[in-house]
């Protein structure tokens, strides 16, 4: 099975949720390790190097937000947050500090499984064809985007992007000057079709994160622009240099 080598760390202080997810994810071919609190999660992460982390928000001592912040200091590992918080602003807090996606409790295990597959697909090192040659370096002013190594440089310094952030940037750059709707971005980058009713603010938060990392003035961007009434577009003219 294609997922056998993928290792997932499940972090939740509820033993029942850990057991359910460990059982379900093991059945569909993942290797699963678990942690019951944030401090344990960081220890296990640094020992096991999982392919993805499923991270509960509400935990004693070090909560999911704190774990996410610590992980982002040292890793681009995909993170899916589990949140029981009702307010939308609470749900997207994890995205703002570096998570790739979130699922609201109570959740369907099948829904979480689908999101895990989608996030892992996009975090894969194999570059999909989005209209930009994967053997080239894209030069846009002070930016260089290596579509083969999935790396970005700003003023010749490496900028750390998560897998989802890179895929979003790659999509926008693939058709520079053409606007993408939030719905189309969700489908192309996250694999979510419109009937799944995913909150489009997932896109907005990731755009904000990209701007913060790539723009000289994130509040007045000149690379990643907002297309009013539509979504977003990448502005600059691209010069393609073959590797």
From Swiss-Prot:
The family database entries (PROSITE patterns) matched by this protein are listed as:
OMPR_PHOB (PS51755), RESPONSE_REGULATORY (PS50110)
Pfam (any one): Trans_reg_C
Give its localization.
Plastid, Chloroplast
Q: Name one GO cellular component term.
A: chloroplast
Annotated InterPro entries: CheY-like_superfamily, OmpR/PhoB-type_DNA-bd, Sig_transdc_resp-reg_C-effctor, Sig_transdc_resp-reg_receiver, WalR-like, WH-like_DNA-bd_sf
- Is the keyword DNA repair in the record? no
List the SUPFAM superfamilies: C-terminal effector domain of the bipartite response regulators, CheY-like
Q: What is this protein called?
A: Probable transcriptional regulator ycf27
Species per Swiss-Prot/TrEMBL record = Porphyra purpurea (Red seaweed)
